């Protein structure tokens, strides 16, 4: 199973501009769900598709699942278009449980904007920590994990013994790691603190039977940038999503 964060989006670019200029709001003219890939993000997705296509056919994805957010759907579609899956592969199948973490009243605010416009939320987050803090109308990491557990149950039920590619978002990748590697809060936040998940970076798991013949996930690689480094049309980016806050 592969977990891939979407390519660079127009929202990633807008967030950087807003933060650099000290603005409180991120200038995005659409809903977060409708934010597309940037031109670089499209090249990143194409490069990743070509990287998958270079694998032997019996090592390529057989099923592609994607978040309903446009940037994830575009990434998944471009990977498939570049031949990154087996012929006749299923998908991209859209699953709303793979969507971005919902930020509620903090949506489109920069870190400085949160401090200035919602100081109570900044204080509450500092007290609870980013794992459990749930902004009004939004989700905590723990909330995201709850829906991802059900998504994994569905994958096990309908796609057992198939190679599955999941195209999603930064926090979703980290929350999948939390579940699959049986992490605790401290462990997953330590991974997060090491740096952002790369746009189109590859996280790969193999599932191997244990002594009780249950399939146990083993992390093969995390945040692999090689597909982008090897392609002249793309470059590596690791920009935070629209709202992340301090680590």
Features from the language model and the residues they span:
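Phosphate-coordination/substrate-recognition cap region in phosphate-metabolizing enzymes
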Residues: 2, 11, 16, 43-123, ...
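Short catalytic helix/loop segments, enriched in acidic residues and glycine
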Residues: 18-45
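Short, conserved phosphate/pyrophosphate- and ester-handling motifs at nucleotide-, phospho-/glycolipid
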Residues: 6, 41, 169
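Acidic, low-complexity terminal tails and accessory targeting/binding regions
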Residues: 1, 101-115, 178-247
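Glycine-rich phosphate-binding loop signature in dinucleotide/nucleotide-binding domains
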Residues: 55-59, 155-162
């Amino acid at each position: 199973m592969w977990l891939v964060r979407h390519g660079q989006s127009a929202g990633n670019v807008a967030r950087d501009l807003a933060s650099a200029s000290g603005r409180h709001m991120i200038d995005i003219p659409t809903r977060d769900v409708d934010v597309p890939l940037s031109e670089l993000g499209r090249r990143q997705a194409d490069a990743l598709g070509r990287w998958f296509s270079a694998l032997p056919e019996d090592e390529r994805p057989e099923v592609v699942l994607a978040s309903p957010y446009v940037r994830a759907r575009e990434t998944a579609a471009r990977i498939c278009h570049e031949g990154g899956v087996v012929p006749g592969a299923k998908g991209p199948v859209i699953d709303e449980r793979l969507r971005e973490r919902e930020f509620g009243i903090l949506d489109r605010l920069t870190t400085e904007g949160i401090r200035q416009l919602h100081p109570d939320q900044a204080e509450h987050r500092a007290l609870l920590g980013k794992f459990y803090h749930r902004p009004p109308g939004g989700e905590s990491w723990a909330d995201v994990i709850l829906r991802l557990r059900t998504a994994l149950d569905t994958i096990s039920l309908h796609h057992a013994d198939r190679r599955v590619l999941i195209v999603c978002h930064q926090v979703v990748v980290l929350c999948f790691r939390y579940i699959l590697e049986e992490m605790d809060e401290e462990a997953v936040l330590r991974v997060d603190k090491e740096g952002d998940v790369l746009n189109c970076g590859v996280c790969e798991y193999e599932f191997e039977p244990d002594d009780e013949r249950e399939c146990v996930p083993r992390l093969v690689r995390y945040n692999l940038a090689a597909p982008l480094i090897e392609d002249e049309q793309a470059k590596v980016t690791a920009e935070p999503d629209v709202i992340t806050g301090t680590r």
